[in-house]
A protein has these predicted regions:
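Short glycine/serine/threonine-rich phosphate/pyrophosphate-binding segments
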Residues: 110, 115-121, 142-144
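Pyridoxal 5′-phosphate
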Residues: 149
Length: 149
């Protein structure tokens, strides 16, 4: 039998400190940005959600949505694995070429999130530049702070 007491204590401490996370259950309404539907514990409410990472509204753009449907019809859903193991989706390769062209570089690389891009940029820099020093403070994004530590 597993002793759950240590885990329960950590959870209780997080709740007391106000650091226990409860994730909002929402549905974004396509074509009605920034409105969403929030599924709360006691009610369902219409809300305005300005916290989305869809800064440019590309997730609402008909051309983007149509392209996604085409890709889904051709390849199905899901990545099929990491690029290193299962290969890289042709759509990702095409997007990387387009981004490189847009920014006038020889190549581009997609990451799953800005957090991961920040982390691995620091890893690459620290491997390429011997004795590099990173200066940071608590105002930096946690992706930078955690990797610098």
């Amino acid at each position: 039998m597993i002793n759950k007491d240590p885990f329960n204590k950590v959870l209780q401490d997080l709740k007391k400190q106000g650091r226990y996370r409860v994730f909002n259950d929402i549905v974004r309404e396509r074509g009605d940005f920034p409105k969403s539907i929030w599924y709360g514990p006691y009610a369902i409410k219409n809300i305005v959600n300005w916290c989305s990472n869809d800064y440019l509204g590309m997730g609402q753009n008909k051309v983007v949505i149509d392209a996604m449907h085409t890709a889904l019809d051709q390849t199905g859903s899901g990545s099929g694995g990491t690029r290193n193991i299962g290969g890289t989706s042709h759509y990702h390769v095409a997007l990387e070429h387009e981004l490189a062209k847009l920014h006038g570089t020889s190549s581009a690389l997609l990451f799953t999130s800005a957090y991961v891009a920040n982390e691995w940029t620091l890893v690459a820099l620290s491997k390429i530049i011997p004795n590099i020093k990173f200066l940071s403070d608590n105002s930096n994004h946690s992706s930078l702070i955690e990797r610098i530590r």
